[in-house]
Protein backbone atom coordinates (compact mmCIF):
# COMPACT_ATOMS: atom_id res chain seq x y z
CA UNK A 1 0.00 0.00 0.00
CA UNK A 2 1.07 3.61 -0.43
CA UNK A 3 2.70 5.31 2.55
CA UNK A 4 0.19 6.79 5.01
CA UNK A 5 -2.66 4.79 3.48
CA UNK A 6 -5.91 6.06 4.97
CA UNK A 7 -8.36 3.34 3.96
CA UNK A 8 -10.52 1.36 6.38
CA UNK A 9 -11.24 -2.38 6.11
CA UNK A 10 -14.53 -3.90 7.26
CA UNK A 11 -14.76 -7.45 8.58
CA UNK A 12 -17.82 -8.50 6.62
CA UNK A 13 -18.81 -11.36 8.91
CA UNK A 14 -18.93 -12.71 12.44
CA UNK A 15 -19.05 -16.27 13.72
CA UNK A 16 -21.99 -18.28 12.33
CA UNK A 17 -23.20 -15.26 10.34
CA UNK A 18 -24.57 -17.47 7.58
CA UNK A 19 -27.56 -15.20 6.93
CA UNK A 20 -26.00 -11.76 7.35
CA UNK A 21 -22.91 -12.71 5.38
CA UNK A 22 -24.67 -14.14 2.34
CA UNK A 23 -22.98 -12.73 -0.76
CA UNK A 24 -26.27 -11.41 -2.11
CA UNK A 25 -27.00 -9.57 1.13
CA UNK A 26 -23.56 -7.97 1.24
CA UNK A 27 -23.79 -6.98 -2.42
CA UNK A 28 -27.12 -5.25 -1.77
CA UNK A 29 -25.33 -2.99 0.76
CA UNK A 30 -22.55 -1.95 -1.62
CA UNK A 31 -23.69 1.67 -2.00
CA UNK A 32 -23.85 2.23 1.75
CA UNK A 33 -20.62 0.38 2.50
CA UNK A 34 -18.72 2.34 -0.13
CA UNK A 35 -19.34 5.53 1.83
CA UNK A 36 -17.24 4.28 4.74
CA UNK A 37 -14.96 1.40 3.72
CA UNK A 38 -12.18 0.84 1.20
CA UNK A 39 -11.80 -2.91 1.75
CA UNK A 40 -14.08 -5.73 2.87
CA UNK A 41 -12.66 -8.93 4.33
CA UNK A 42 -14.91 -11.96 3.84
CA UNK A 43 -14.62 -15.50 5.27
CA UNK A 44 -12.84 -18.35 3.49
CA UNK A 45 -15.11 -18.87 0.51
CA UNK A 46 -14.27 -22.38 -0.69
CA UNK A 47 -16.62 -25.33 -0.33
CA UNK A 48 -16.19 -27.43 2.82
CA UNK A 49 -17.24 -31.00 3.58
CA UNK A 50 -19.72 -29.65 6.14
CA UNK A 51 -22.32 -27.50 4.37
CA UNK A 52 -22.73 -25.41 7.54
CA UNK A 53 -19.08 -24.44 7.86
CA UNK A 54 -17.66 -20.95 8.36
CA UNK A 55 -14.83 -22.01 6.06
CA UNK A 56 -11.97 -22.63 8.46
CA UNK A 57 -11.82 -26.36 7.71
CA UNK A 58 -11.21 -25.98 3.95
CA UNK A 59 -11.63 -28.96 1.64
CA UNK A 60 -12.06 -27.53 -1.86
CA UNK A 61 -9.94 -24.65 -3.10
CA UNK A 62 -11.37 -24.13 -6.58
CA UNK A 63 -15.04 -24.86 -5.80
CA UNK A 64 -16.33 -21.57 -4.42
CA UNK A 65 -19.88 -22.67 -3.62
CA UNK A 66 -20.06 -22.22 0.14
CA UNK A 67 -22.44 -21.70 3.05
CA UNK A 68 -22.55 -18.01 2.07
CA UNK A 69 -23.73 -18.50 -1.50
CA UNK A 70 -22.72 -19.70 -4.94
CA UNK A 71 -19.53 -18.94 -6.81
CA UNK A 72 -21.57 -16.88 -9.27
CA UNK A 73 -23.02 -14.80 -6.42
CA UNK A 74 -19.57 -14.31 -4.93
CA UNK A 75 -18.10 -13.10 -8.22
CA UNK A 76 -21.05 -10.74 -8.67
CA UNK A 77 -20.53 -9.30 -5.18
CA UNK A 78 -16.81 -8.76 -5.74
CA UNK A 79 -17.48 -7.14 -9.12
CA UNK A 80 -20.11 -4.82 -7.63
CA UNK A 81 -17.83 -3.85 -4.75
CA UNK A 82 -15.07 -3.08 -7.24
CA UNK A 83 -17.39 -0.81 -9.23
CA UNK A 84 -18.05 1.12 -6.01
CA UNK A 85 -14.36 1.48 -5.17
CA UNK A 86 -14.23 -1.35 -2.62
CA UNK A 87 -11.59 -4.09 -2.76
CA UNK A 88 -12.46 -7.57 -1.49
CA UNK A 89 -10.00 -9.46 0.73
CA UNK A 90 -10.02 -13.27 0.77
CA UNK A 91 -9.49 -15.23 3.96
CA UNK A 92 -6.74 -17.67 2.97
CA UNK A 93 -6.57 -20.80 5.14
CA UNK A 94 -3.50 -22.74 4.02
CA UNK A 95 -1.81 -23.71 7.28
CA UNK A 96 -4.16 -26.66 7.47
CA UNK A 97 -6.51 -28.61 5.23
CA UNK A 98 -9.44 -30.88 5.93
CA UNK A 99 -9.53 -34.43 4.59
CA UNK A 100 -12.14 -37.08 3.87
CA UNK A 101 -11.07 -39.58 6.50
CA UNK A 102 -7.46 -39.15 7.57
CA UNK A 103 -5.64 -38.75 4.28
CA UNK A 104 -7.93 -38.13 1.28
CA UNK A 105 -7.63 -34.73 -0.41
CA UNK A 106 -9.76 -33.80 -3.45
CA UNK A 107 -8.32 -33.58 -6.96
CA UNK A 108 -9.34 -30.27 -8.55
CA UNK A 109 -8.84 -28.90 -12.05
CA UNK A 110 -8.30 -25.28 -13.06
CA UNK A 111 -7.19 -23.98 -16.44
CA UNK A 112 -6.52 -27.49 -17.67
CA UNK A 113 -4.23 -28.51 -14.80
CA UNK A 114 -5.17 -30.84 -11.94
CA UNK A 115 -4.07 -30.07 -8.40
CA UNK A 116 -4.19 -32.43 -5.43
CA UNK A 117 -2.53 -32.48 -2.04
CA UNK A 118 -1.08 -35.83 -0.95
CA UNK A 119 -0.46 -37.63 2.33
CA UNK A 120 3.24 -36.80 1.86
CA UNK A 121 2.26 -33.12 2.14
CA UNK A 122 1.23 -33.62 5.79
CA UNK A 123 3.83 -32.71 8.43
CA UNK A 124 5.34 -35.64 10.29
CA UNK A 125 4.18 -34.54 13.75
CA UNK A 126 0.62 -33.56 12.75
CA UNK A 127 -1.96 -33.73 15.55
CA UNK A 128 0.76 -34.39 18.11
CA UNK A 129 1.76 -37.64 16.41
CA UNK A 130 -1.74 -39.13 16.09
CA UNK A 131 -1.65 -38.79 12.31
CA UNK A 132 1.66 -40.67 12.12
CA UNK A 133 0.21 -43.47 14.22
CA UNK A 134 -2.76 -43.73 11.85
CA UNK A 135 -0.47 -43.53 8.81
CA UNK A 136 1.64 -46.40 10.15
CA UNK A 137 -1.50 -48.48 10.65
CA UNK A 138 -2.77 -47.68 7.16
CA UNK A 139 0.59 -48.04 5.42
CA UNK A 140 0.53 -44.38 4.37
CA UNK A 141 3.57 -42.10 4.09
CA UNK A 142 3.75 -38.58 5.52
CA UNK A 143 6.29 -35.82 4.91
CA UNK A 144 9.69 -36.24 6.55
CA UNK A 145 9.50 -32.61 7.71
CA UNK A 146 8.19 -31.43 11.06
CA UNK A 147 5.71 -28.58 11.43
CA UNK A 148 7.35 -25.16 11.14
CA UNK A 149 5.00 -23.67 13.72
CA UNK A 150 2.00 -24.39 15.91
CA UNK A 151 -0.02 -27.57 15.44
CA UNK A 152 -3.77 -27.47 14.83
CA UNK A 153 -5.75 -30.54 15.85
CA UNK A 154 -8.62 -31.77 13.73
CA UNK A 155 -7.28 -30.96 10.27
CA UNK A 156 -4.05 -31.94 8.54
CA UNK A 157 -1.21 -29.43 8.97
CA UNK A 158 0.50 -28.89 5.63
CA UNK A 159 4.24 -29.00 4.98
CA UNK A 160 4.93 -25.73 3.18
CA UNK A 161 8.44 -26.92 2.32
CA UNK A 162 6.77 -29.41 -0.01
CA UNK A 163 7.03 -28.46 -3.69
CA UNK A 164 3.55 -29.88 -4.26
CA UNK A 165 2.02 -27.79 -1.46
CA UNK A 166 3.66 -24.69 -2.88
CA UNK A 167 2.39 -25.48 -6.38
CA UNK A 168 -1.18 -26.07 -5.17
CA UNK A 169 -1.30 -22.99 -2.93
CA UNK A 170 0.14 -20.71 -5.61
CA UNK A 171 -2.40 -21.97 -8.15
CA UNK A 172 -5.20 -21.50 -5.61
CA UNK A 173 -4.17 -17.92 -4.87
CA UNK A 174 -3.83 -17.06 -8.56
CA UNK A 175 -7.34 -18.46 -8.99
CA UNK A 176 -8.66 -16.21 -6.21
CA UNK A 177 -7.20 -13.16 -7.93
CA UNK A 178 -7.71 -13.93 -11.61
CA UNK A 179 -10.92 -15.95 -11.52
CA UNK A 180 -12.76 -14.55 -8.51
CA UNK A 181 -11.50 -10.96 -8.43
CA UNK A 182 -10.02 -10.71 -4.93
CA UNK A 183 -7.33 -8.02 -4.56
CA UNK A 184 -5.65 -9.26 -1.40
CA UNK A 185 -5.42 -11.88 1.31
CA UNK A 186 -5.84 -12.21 5.05
CA UNK A 187 -3.82 -15.29 6.03
CA UNK A 188 -5.30 -17.44 8.77
CA UNK A 189 -3.14 -18.87 11.58
CA UNK A 190 0.22 -17.71 10.29
CA UNK A 191 1.95 -18.99 13.42
CA UNK A 192 1.58 -22.45 11.93
CA UNK A 193 4.14 -22.04 9.13
CA UNK A 194 7.06 -19.82 8.20
CA UNK A 195 6.35 -16.29 7.05
CA UNK A 196 8.83 -16.78 4.21
CA UNK A 197 6.19 -18.84 2.40
CA UNK A 198 3.73 -15.95 2.61
CA UNK A 199 6.26 -13.81 0.78
CA UNK A 200 6.58 -16.43 -1.97
CA UNK A 201 2.82 -16.86 -2.27
CA UNK A 202 2.18 -13.12 -2.43
CA UNK A 203 4.81 -12.68 -5.14
CA UNK A 204 3.23 -15.44 -7.20
CA UNK A 205 -0.30 -14.05 -6.81
CA UNK A 206 0.58 -10.41 -7.46
CA UNK A 207 -1.81 -9.08 -4.84
CA UNK A 208 -2.25 -5.51 -3.62
CA UNK A 209 -2.76 -6.22 0.10
CA UNK A 210 -1.73 -8.88 2.62
CA UNK A 211 -2.18 -9.26 6.36
CA UNK A 212 -1.46 -12.25 8.59
CA UNK A 213 -3.31 -13.38 11.71
CA UNK A 214 -0.46 -12.89 14.16
CA UNK A 215 -1.84 -11.89 17.55
CA UNK A 216 1.05 -11.48 19.98
CA UNK A 217 3.55 -9.06 21.45
CA UNK A 218 5.30 -6.45 19.37
CA UNK A 219 8.48 -8.49 18.99
CA UNK A 220 6.71 -11.57 17.66
CA UNK A 221 4.67 -9.51 15.22
CA UNK A 222 7.77 -7.65 14.00
CA UNK A 223 9.69 -10.92 13.56
CA UNK A 224 6.86 -12.43 11.53
CA UNK A 225 6.63 -9.39 9.26
CA UNK A 226 10.40 -9.54 8.79
CA UNK A 227 10.10 -13.25 7.89
CA UNK A 228 7.79 -12.24 5.04
CA UNK A 229 10.46 -9.81 3.80
CA UNK A 230 7.95 -7.12 4.74
CA UNK A 231 5.58 -8.36 2.05
CA UNK A 232 2.72 -8.69 4.53
CA UNK A 233 1.31 -6.75 7.44
CA UNK A 234 0.10 -8.45 10.62
Question: Could you describe each region identified by the protein language model?
Answer:
Residues 1-11, 15, 25-34, 44-57, ...:
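Active-site-proximal helices and loops of the catalytic beta/alpha 8
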Residues 62-68:
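Short coil/turn segments at secondary-structure boundaries
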Residues 22, 79, 109-117, 131, ...:
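First exposed extracellular module after export/assembly in secreted or surface-exposed proteins
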Residues 51-60, 96-142, 203-204:
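Aromatic- and acidic-residue-enriched segments that line the glycan-binding/catalytic groove
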Residues 45, 116-182, 190-192, 197-198, ...:
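Polysaccharide-binding and catalytic clefts of secreted carbohydrate-active enzymes
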Residues 4, 17-27, 68, 72, ...:
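Soluble non-cytosolic domains of exported or imported proteins
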Residues 39, 69-112:
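Substrate-binding cleft of carbohydrate-active enzyme catalytic domains
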Amino acid sequence: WPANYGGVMLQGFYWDSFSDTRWTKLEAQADELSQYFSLIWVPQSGKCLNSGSMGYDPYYYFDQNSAFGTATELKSMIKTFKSKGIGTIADVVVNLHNTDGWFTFPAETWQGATYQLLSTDIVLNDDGGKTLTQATTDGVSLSANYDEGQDWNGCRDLDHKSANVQTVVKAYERFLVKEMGYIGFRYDMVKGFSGSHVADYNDAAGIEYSVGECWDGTGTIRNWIDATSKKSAA
